[in-house]
Structure formats: C-alpha cells, structure tokens
Swiss-Prot record:
SMART domains: ARF, RAB, SAR. This is ADP-ribosylation factor-like protein 3. Found in a complex with ARL3, RP2 and UNC119 (or UNC119B); RP2 induces hydrolysis of GTP ARL3 in the complex, leading to the release of UNC119 (or UNC119B). Interacts with RP2; interaction is direct and stimulated with the activated GTP-bound form of ARL3. Interacts with SYS1. Interacts with ARL2BP; the GTP-bound form interacts with ARL2BP. Microtubule-associated protein. Does not interact with TBCC. Interacts with RP2. Interacts with PDE6D; the interaction occurs specifically with the GTP-bound form of ARL3. It is a peripheral membrane protein. GO terms for molecular function: GDP binding; GTP binding; GTPase activity; magnesium ion binding; microtubule binding.
Length: 182
C-alpha cells in the first residue's frame, strides 16, 4: 500500500487542455509563431492552406493551438473553428502598415462573434525585429484596443523569427486561462 501511494503521488496530474485559436492575415507570422512555440525548425515556412494543429506543454497546461490560414479566401471558414475556444491569439505583421486597416476590420469582426464572446484575446504585434515595424502601443491605438470592454486582452510585441516576446505572451495566455477556468 505504501508503494502504491508513492506511485500515485509521482504520477503527475494530467495537464489541463486549452484550445487556442491562432488567427491573423496571411503572412502575419502565425505558422512561424506556432513552430517557435513547439521548438521546431522555422527555416522553411510555407503559407497555410488549411490549418495546422500543435500541442504545446506550458505551465501545467496542454495548449492545443489551431493555426488557421489567413488568406482572404480562407477567412470565411475561420468561424468553423470558433467552438470551444479558450483563448484567441491574433497575429499582426507590425511592419505591413498598408494592411493595418484590413487587419483591424478582421479583428473587429472576430470580437463581435457570439461564439468568441468573453474569450480572452492576445494580440501579437509580430515582426518587431524589422526596422519598419510599428510599436505595439501605436498598433493598439490604431486598432482602438482600449475600447474592448467585454473581455481581457493584451498586446505583446514579439518576433516569431527570433522568439523575442513570445514567451511573455504565452505567460499571459496561461495566466488568463487559469483565471477563466476557475
């Protein structure tokens, strides 16, 4: 009986599963970000034609990340993936200022979706390693993120290529999943 109780204690509690939806326009860096999270090679990334799913362990959670392609023709299918989403991560190419209006419209539509109501949102202001990248504060202002009142949100500067800022964003994700699941 003593050995059995020791074995039970050694067997860690199963990680809590979390469904994360990773969205953003094409070429924002979603797949690079996902591969960075999974510690995979990021030297050969091709546009996502459908979706990628990866499970990443972090802080006692099993994060099931759904990376959905961002091309205009794929975006109408995004809503097929909304069900049971715990966290929305929206990735923006901070250096592609010509598409800020388009990415803002897409984010606004997502925030209005009933199936995503109250779902915490992390906006990754990606590609901060580029000289032309807009700072996260400027992007937050341009997207009027300060007007979001129905959920917790965060904007995080990052570079999916170098990994800078990615872990800070994922720490926020785990903290807010913890708060949501309690």
């Amino acid at each position: 009986m003593g050995l059995l109780s020791i074995l039970r204690k050694l067997k860690s509690a199963p990680d809590q599963e979390v469904r994360i939806l990773l969205l953003g326009l094409d070429n924002a860096g979603k797949t690079t970000l996902l591969k960075q999270l999974a510690s995979e090679d990021i030297s050969h990334i091709t546009p996502t034609q459908g979706f990628n799913i990866k499970s990443v362990q972090s802080q006692g959670f099993k994060l099931n990340v759904w990376d959905i392609g961002g091309q205009r023709k794929i975006r109408p299918y995004w809503r097929s993936y909304f069900e049971n989403t715990d966290i929305l991560i929206y990735v923006i190419d901070s250096a592609d200022r010509k598409r800020f209006e388009e990415t803002g419209q897409e984010l606004t539509e997502l925030l209005e979706e009933e199936k995503l109501s109250c779902v915490p949102v992390l906006v990754f202001a990606n590609k901060q390693d580029l000289l032309t990248a807009a700072p996260a504060a400027e992007i937050a202002e341009g997207l009027n993120l300060h007007t979001i009142r129905d959920r917790v949100w965060q904007i995080q500067s990052c570079s999916a290529l170098t990994g800078e800022g990615v872990q800070d964003g994922m720490n926020w994700v785990c903290k807010n999943v913890n708060a949501k699941k309690k």
